[in-house]
Design a protein with these regions (language model features):
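Active-site-adjacent loops and short helices of periplasmic peptidoglycan-processing enzymes
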Residues: 3-170, 179-180, 247
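Penicillin-recognizing serine hydrolase domain
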Residues: 8-32, 132-297
Length: 298
């Protein structure tokens, strides 16, 4: 894979001024939710769309974006270490399944980061690029500054709970927007199944499956193609899901946080795309009091 030239993108902002409605409790279980037009940034509907959330593994969308922008050779390899694997096992964190001493291709780390939500891959990419996770996180926060994300801060690459690893639904939508503008990020985030290269430790390679797509058949919402996404979960964050969908020539981003279960997050996603996309958001409709675009500590 060739390193892509970074596309020149004007600063993308989420526009709450035309939001005609807030999600009903009947339609959306998640405590926090937002649906935006991915081209204009206009908010179609939301629930506390600018409130503080813990993004859990949605963090990895920023991780892959920063990683891809800093990788020169996607066919290079990184040796997986005991020091990376052991703390994740102790924390019962998700891993792609690479083994100690295994030489893993960088491209395989990217797929392992997103599809099974591998914390091992997150730290491996950070160490490969920056020498340590701490140094890589500095790049993530620098990227937040570049994108104008004043309400987002990262403290780790995987989304494990930390008081200083936070965002908002609106900011996560912006991060997803930029990730989908990058062809390699888009390809990885859009993949259902991927097999890593064969190694001595994994002679058949590792079959990786998307935690999002494995919960979908693909035809649940007529006329809508959910093309990419990333799940997340911690006890504090609840169930989270950021997704990117198209309907005709239009594209949309939905972010959900603090849902009751992984399945309810999927059902919420279907409901959002099925019931809220048809709204005409070109007219000047004010957000009601519940839809305030002020940052809050909810």
């Amino acid at each position: 894979i060739q390193t892509p030239t970074e596309p020149e993108i004007e600063l993308f902002e989420v526009d709450f001024s035309k939001s005609p409605s807030n999600f009903t409790e009947e339609d959306v279980n998640s405590k926090y939710a937002i649906l935006i037009d991915a081209e204009t940034g206009v908010v179609i509907s939301h629930r506390s769309g600018n409130a503080k959330i813990y993004p859990a593994s949605m963090t990895k969308v920023m991780t892959i974006l920063v990683a891809v922008e800093n990788i020169k050779d996607f066919n290079a390899t990184f040796e997986m270490t005991y020091e990376i694997i052991k703390p994740l096992v102790d924390a019962d964190a998700t891993r792609a399944g690479f083994k100690e001493g295994e030489d893993v291709k960088i491209i395989d780390l990217l797929y392992g980061l997103i599809l099974p939500s591998g914390g091992d891959c997150a730290i491996a990419l950070a160490e490969y690029i920056s020498g340590s996770e701490e140094e890589f996180v500095k790049l993530m926060n620098k990227k937040c500054e570049e994108l104008g994300l004043e309400n987002t801060h990262f403290s780790n690459t995987s989304g494990l709970h930390d008081e200083n690893n936070y965002s908002t639904p609106a900011d996560m939508a912006i991060i997803m927007k930029y990730a989908m503008e990058n062809p390699i990020c888009r390809e990885v985030l859009s993949t259902y199944k991927y097999t890593t290269e064969k190694t001595e430790e994994n002679p058949e390679g590792i079959e990786l499956f998307s935690t999002m797509f494995s919960r979908m058949y693909g035809n649940e919402v007529e006329g809508v193609d959910i093309v990419a996404g990333k799940t997340g979960y911690t006890t504090e964050a609840g169930n989270c899901l950021v997704s990117y969908a198209t309907k005709g020539e239009k594209s949309y981003i939905c972010v959900l946080a603090d849902g009751e279960s992984k399945w309810k997050s999927i059902y919420d996603t279907f409901a959002v795309y099925e019931k809220y996309i048809p709204f005409d958001v070109t007219t000047d409709i004010s957000v009601n009091d519940e839809g305030s675009d002020e940052i809050s500590e909810e």
